[in-house]
Curated annotation (Swiss-Prot):
The gene is ALB3L3. This is ALBINO3-like protein 3, mitochondrial. Keywords: Membrane, Mitochondrion, Mitochondrion inner membrane, Repeat, TPR repeat, Transit peptide, Transmembrane, Transmembrane helix. Residues 555-566 have a biased composition (Low complexity). InterPro entries: TPR-like_helical_dom_sf, TPR_rpt, YidC/ALB3/OXA1/COX18. GO terms for molecular function: membrane insertase activity. Gene3D superfamilies: Tetratricopeptide repeat domain. Pfam families: TPR_8. It comes from Arabidopsis thaliana. Belongs to the OXA1/ALB3/YidC (TC 2.A.9.2) family. Probably required for the insertion of integral membrane proteins into the mitochondrial inner membrane.
Amino acid sequence: MAFRRVLLSHLRRSHHTCSSLSPHHVSATTQPSIALALFQSRFFSTPSDLDSELTRFRDDSIAGVGSNDHGLEFDDSIASLGSNGHGLEFGDSIGSLGSNGYGLEFGDLSQDLSNYDYLTQPVISLLDSYHDITGLPWWVVIATSTVAFRTALLPILILQRKQTKRISQFLPKLPHFWPPQGSGRSVLDQLKLFRKERKDIGCPSFLWVPAYFSIQISCFFLWITSIRRMSLDHHPGFDSGGALWFQNLTEIPNGLYGPLFPFLIAGLHYTNTQITFTASSVHKVDKFTELAKAYKTFLNLLTCALYFLSFQMPQGSLLYWATNLSFSIAQQSILNHPVVSAKLGLQANDSVQKEAGNPILTNINEGKLTDPSSKGRLISVHNLTPKELVALSAKYLSGGHKDKSIPLLRLALEKDPEYLQAMIILGQALYQKDQFAEAAKCLEQAASKLLDTSPTEVEEVDLLIVASQWAGVSNIRQGKTSEGITHLERVANMKEPDDPKSKAHYLDALVLYSSAIFNEGRREEAAKYLRRVVAYDPSFSELLKQCEEDDTIPTSSSSNSTSKTS
């Protein structure tokens, strides 16, 4: 009894402290902790069987005051809700709802929510301030803030484009990423070599390629998540802050006009993908062609997924997304305009390769040419790669500037004597200057090298057809008809290619071969090959008719066929 009196005295002295801790006696002015608030919310509730246990403990404790049936004293019931294996310390019940399998820890959850607020709250506060200051509808606030934010990122995009343009210039001069077959170098050694060569020539870091995308995508997810949070929390004004078919920004797309937003998102994403890959400089380089194609295919397939995903997002988030995509399309279109890109220094540097109508060889003997993208600065043709030299010479050749194209082709062959395309184009240029002997030599050399490798690739087969065709014509123009027919016959005996471009060259060679063997008196054989040509190109029907009816083919017909082939 003495022990009970001491304990009761202690409880009376500590009654105020215990009451302040009880969830049933929280002062109205006291701010509850986040764990207790979550505990009392409708999202978290005590399991029903735990409630029944607590009720039973309460009843037992009341019934057991002064009784020894259950071995429970009133003082013990205060310290513990029972001694039958379900004892719950009140202090522990705040952090955990029991020790019988129903414990819920709120510490980690509150920390996650705190981190979530830490990321999104600044954006929400910024949008709230903008809305309070301007008084604009929420849909205008979301759209205009998106445009303002993307405009702020524009300098980063311009800088990144300049760096990627420089990277595309240096890439042809860099070694391969992977060690060539038979080089004996490991992948690590090859990467070290690539890094060393990149630094030696002053090529910017490849981290510039994903730089803007990384920043933009991070900001995109932060912004769209913040607006989604506002929509799901029914932010003040969001229920009626929309327009047109999206009056309620907190709802997901529904009703008759529900598919409009998803269709708009998918269409804008697809359009933006096409414009982006058209404007990119890096993906035009051979080293990145396959990677860029695969990534573009992935983004195109993603269009369908985004359509269905949009049905699960609030219309406030979809409004931001549509505005963001629309800005991207407008931004790409403006930056790709020749005048704008020239002013900003973003003009693609494949002008040497694809805009040879502007570069002018001011002094081919001194090896100088004008690069219009560098505002008149002269660059040396000796610094160009063989591929760039051939591309430039082909432009001059197609424009009738044979005298300018031939020195470039010879320079390309000096740098790479095995460059077959340079040999063939040089032979064509020499043929057009009536230098048939030298033209035949170049073309026969190219055909011989191709035959040694037994070509199977589409490009190699096409080069063999073109080289043999022009070699045959060059020999015939020298009076070496038998040698010329031999080259043309090689093409006639080849399997008809499936590639449209190769097939066109193949049919041209058959026309020349038919004309040559008809002049040698092989009329029936010539008609046989012409029938194969007419099956694809009826424009040669008149030539076939003359071949079948007359003993001679008019010279004009042969000239026309040769001219068409050229």
